């Protein structure tokens, strides 16, 4: 009986491959899909909260929150990180509000950044689809979903009712994009705004525009909110921002990261290093004083940050210890071994695919993926 079932299965598999092509169906052990490639978010604290060391490649990420909370800053840091490691980034600026000077201060190479400011939502999403389909883009940012206005609404009169147009547009676009993103291993970052439901008496009245499709298709959803202001005397020089991982299909969700977003500078690297080093006792905190080894580096958090800014050698040393303590550098030999194992299992690739498999640019790292999505919110 067992042999008959096996023969029937083999016949079915051969028929599927004949009708739909080789690779249409395979055993997961043969496909070697047990690892997921990631790109750093540009923030150590956020990389740790994401659980896999960054944004997973080939997936959709939604970043939402109130106005001026730091959503665009978080996205631009990911763009800068991709470019820093030799990747290509594209930015769909539907809001027509991207500040190139600020982006450059965050480390974005604006000369190489692909920028589009579409007239309609349909045009913006078609451009996004074309860029992703090319297979040459590592990260695509759409800023923002709320600004992807359907053509019918733009060409219509003020006051005309256009119920559900944007939701249908997003649903159709995401159905097309999700498969292409997975094949090309492009990260799609969708920035979104917040709206309030009218008449909600109990529960959270907040919602995001664009319908439910993005909530379902997103592998990761990040909620970005200002926690408090950062002051220097009476001057406000930045904001303390909380980033909550509301949904995560590749690691446990609901983790949080707190970062300092300084005006004109973006996420403070020294701020997160001070916090993370203190949490692991790499930097000792006694009262209001911070100490590293036998040296006191500052009284109060802001003074400790200034010390690290002024001593880049100490900063680099502590940063490396933080990465080691949080397990962020365990991608070298282990990933090479994983690649070797997957090559042994897979069919011998062509010369072209072998060239693509070589690590020409260290844009991505790989992390083990828990394939059981039943524990996560889909």
Curated annotation (Swiss-Prot):
It is found in: Cytoplasm. The keyword Nucleotide-binding applies. Residues 339-351 have a biased composition (Basic and acidic residues). One of its GO terms (molecular function) is ATP-dependent DNA damage sensor activity. Residues 325-378 are annotated as: Disordered. SUPFAM superfamilies: P-loop containing nucleoside triphosphate hydrolases (SSF52540), RecA protein, C-terminal domain (SSF54752). Keywords: ATP-binding, Cytoplasm, DNA damage, DNA recombination, DNA repair, DNA-binding, Nucleotide-binding, SOS response. Transmembrane segments: none annotated. Gene3D superfamilies: P-loop containing nucleotide triphosphate hydrolases (3.40.50.300). Can catalyze the hydrolysis of ATP in the presence of single-stranded DNA, the ATP-dependent uptake of single-stranded DNA by duplex DNA, and the ATP-dependent hybridization of homologous single-stranded DNAs. It interacts with LexA causing its activation and leading to its autocatalytic cleavage. NCBIfam families: tigrfam_recA. This is Protein RecA.
């Amino acid at each position: 009986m067992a042999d008959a079932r096996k023969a029937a299965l083999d016949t079915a598999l051969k028929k599927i491959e004949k009708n739909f092509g080789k690779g249409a169906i395979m055993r997961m052990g043969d496909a070697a899909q047990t690892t997921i490639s990631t790109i750093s978010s540009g923030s150590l604290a956020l990389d740790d909260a994401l659980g896999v060391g960054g944004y997973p490649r080939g997936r959709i990420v939604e970043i939402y929150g109130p106005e001026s909370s730091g959503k665009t800053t978080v996205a631009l840091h990911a763009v800068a990180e991709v470019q820093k490691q030799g990747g290509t980034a594209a930015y769909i600026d539907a809001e027509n509000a991207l500040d190139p000077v600020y982006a450059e201060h965050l480390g974005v190479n604006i000369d190489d950044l692909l920028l589009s400011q579409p007239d309609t939502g349909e045009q913006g999403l078609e451009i996004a689809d074309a860029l992703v389909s090319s297979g040459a883009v590592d990260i695509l940012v759409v800023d923002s979903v709320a600004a992807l206005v359907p053509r019918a609404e733009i060409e219509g009169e003020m006051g005309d009712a256009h119920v559900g147009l944007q939701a249908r547009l997003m649903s159709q676009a995401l159905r097309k994009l999700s498969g292409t993103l997975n094949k090309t291993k492009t990260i799609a970052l969708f920035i979104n705004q917040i709206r309030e439901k009218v008449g909600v008496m109990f529960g959270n009245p907040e919602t995001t525009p664009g319908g439910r499709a993005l909530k379902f298709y997103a592998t990761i959803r990040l909620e970005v909110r200002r926690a408090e202001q950062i002051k220097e005397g009476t001057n406000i020089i930045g904001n303390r921002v909380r980033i909550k991982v509301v949904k995560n299909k590749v690691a446990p969700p609901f983790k949080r990261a707190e970062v300092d977003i300084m005006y004109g500078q973006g996420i403070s690297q020294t701020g997160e290093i001070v916090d993370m080093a203190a949490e692991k006792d790499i930097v000792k905190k006694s009262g209001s004083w911070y100490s590293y080894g036998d040296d006191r580096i500052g009284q109060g958090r802001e003074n400790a940050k200034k010390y690290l800014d002024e001593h880049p050698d100490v900063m680099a040393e502590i940063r490396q210890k933080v990465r080691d303590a949080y397990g962020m550098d365990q991608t070298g030999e282990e990933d090479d071994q994983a690649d070797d194992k997957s090559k042994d299992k897979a069919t011998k690739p062509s010369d072209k695919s072998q060239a693509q498999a070589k690590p020409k640019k260290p844009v991505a790292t790989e992390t083990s993926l828990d394939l059981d999505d039943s524990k996560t919110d889909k």
